[in-house]
Structure formats: C-alpha cells, structure tokens
C-alpha cells in the first residue's frame, strides 16, 4: 500500500518526515517569525500613516485658517467691495485676524467709503465678530440680540423693525442676510453703511425703544471657545481725536490722513485714499516726516484683481517723503530735479513740456488737490511709472528716512507690510 505523501513534503514518506523533525522544527519557527515581523511592520506603517494623516490635516486646518482671510479679500474685491478688501488686507497686519478660527465681517460698499470716509482700526474692529454667523442664524436672531465684536466690551445690536421692510438690521443699518462669502470659517455680509459707533448707539438707546438697552433679557451671542487669542490692540487715535485738521500741528497725523482720504474718496481716488487712510501711526516717536502723494485715479490703475502686494507697491511708488506744493514742483521741474520715492531704489523725474508739468512723462492734472502743513496730494489721470535709480544721477533731491538717507540700490522684493506711516 502506498503511503500518502506528506502534506508539506510530498516527496518524503512518514518515516523520513519523522527523521527530519529537527529540520522541520527549525523551519517551523520561520513562519511565526515572518508573521511577527510582518505584524510589526504593518503596525509601524499604520502608525506612520496615522501621524502623516494627522500632520497633513493639521497643516490643512492651519492653511485653511490662514488663507480664509486672503480668500475673503479677493472675493470682496470681485464683489464690489474693493475698499473693504483693501482695508481688510492692510488692517489684518495689525489685527492678526488669522488668530481667530471663526470670523463674521460686515462689509460696507465702496459708496459708503466715499460717503463716510476710511474707518480707523478701532472702527474696523466694530465691523468684525469673532464668531461665525451663517445666513440662517443671522436671519433668525431676535430683535435686541447682541453680537460680540473684536472691539473689547462692545457688541452689535440686532435692530429689526418694520421700518426696514422686513430686512435684517444691525445697529439701525440694513445688512444683507445672504453672505457674500462663506468658507466655513469666515462669513462676510454686505451692509448699507458703517455701523454707528458704540457711543452714538448708547445715546440713541436712551431715547428710542427700537434699540434695547444693554440690560435687556434678550440673549447674547457668546464668543466661541475656539477664539482664545485676542489680537493685540494697535496704537491708534481715540474716537475723540478724529477731527478735521487745520493749519496748526495736529496731535497725531491720522487726523490729516483721514481728512485727505475723505477728499480723495469723493474725487474718484478710492484705491490711493484707502492706503492713505490706513497710515495710522501717531507722532509720539517725534517723527516729523512730511509727505507728498501723487494720486492716480482708480481707472488708471490696471486690473482691479491684481495682487494686493502690487497695490502696496503702486502706493509706495507714488509717495515721496517731502512736502511739495505746486510751486515747489514747478521750481524743481525747471531744475530737472529727481525725487526719490519711498519705494526704495525708484525715483521720479520732474520736467516741463511747455507749461505742463510732467512726472516721468505723466502730466499733472490736479495740482494741490489737498494741502496742509504735513501732506500734499496732487492728482493724475495716469499712473506714474517709477524708474530704477541710477548710480550717477547728478544733482538729485535727498530724501530722509527717519533722519537717515534712503538706502541705495534697486528695490528687489516688495513687502506688503507698511512701516511708520506705511511709507518705508
């Protein structure tokens, strides 16, 4: 009778199989070792995969938080809120909006900026809430509900009433109840105007029943627990100092910038006016720098969807750190002088063509558009294309930068950060 071949060794009989127990026992450990090694390898791969997924998700969450504001800026620019987009872009450097995981922004239109002027950083905080309010939530807020803002100890009040035709109203300002932008982190709503300052709301509430008092039993919207880091408060002027400038030296230069900005807004220079109004530094450092702004109209600035760093470059290329009136420019033009802009390494040549004053070949159309003791603004129908500074330029006008001469060389990499007065 033939012996059945071994399952594992078909060529060996049972006796031979017994005789090779040592060999089989020696090999019998190998599958277990391989299995153990395979399990360890699999566990290691799973652990590595887990950490990679966690790391990628963590980066993605951070990236989403950091890019939400940038995306919001672009959407604002494309949706008829260019002034608010520019303001948000620059104000973000001081307000550190990326520190907040959720935000709701109420954006006034460009017409509102022209009518009311550029808001201060303090006022900007009043347009921002550190909580996300989706459209359905906003529409269902009861009259008198409080909405927290980035402005410490001040909140917005829902003021819905029949006089607004059933539309959502906050601080007596009509707000669109459909968001312009909502990426799950940042929500933006358009508003007819800027929200009234807390002081005025407080005064109105004492004489009007349409706005509940702060002691109302109506619930308030809490600041979410995720909003744990409060952005630092910038050093800006208080509301009481925001007066129109006169010929005397002001307490701080924000007064002057704001007044000049309002004029430019009303004359069609919204982009330059926006940047000018955001120069919020005060005069406590003793910096007596005076400036001249050569302002092109909005239509002269190409492509409204250009990167905002390009807008910064355009602004800096149209500003010099000297107070130059129309008569001064005429004098320099006769001398063939060259002005150094605050865009380091770039300059503007002043010349005459008959009786027309040219800056790098661009005619000056609106001389002395705005002038006081610290700032002069001249208007142009075209952008001034600044030229790279040459090594030997002859007799040029020296521009001081906080008491130090402007650095030589071509401006290689443009920064979106604005220094003192945003000019260097």
UniProtKB/Swiss-Prot annotation:
Q: How does it sit in the membrane?
A: Single-pass membrane protein
Which residues get glycosylated? 153, 160, 246, 283, 287
A Pfam family assignment: Fasciclin
| Gene3D superfamilies referenced in this protein's UniProt entry, alphabetically | FAS1 domain (2.30.180.10)
Q: For this UniProt entry, which segments traverse the membrane?
A: 46-66
Q: Does the keyword Glycoprotein apply?
A: yes
Q: Where is the composition biased (Polar residues)?
A: 227-246
Tell me which GO cellular component terms the UniProt record holds.
membrane
Region annotation Disordered: where it falls in the sequence: 199-246, 405-424
Q: Where is the composition biased (Low complexity)?
A: 199-226
| Chain ranges of the FAS1 domain | 56-194, 250-384
| Subcellular location, record wording | Membrane
Summarizing the function annotation, the protein's role is: May be a cell surface adhesion protein.
Q: What name does this protein carry? A: Putative fasciclin-like arabinogalactan protein 20
- Chain's gene name: FLA20
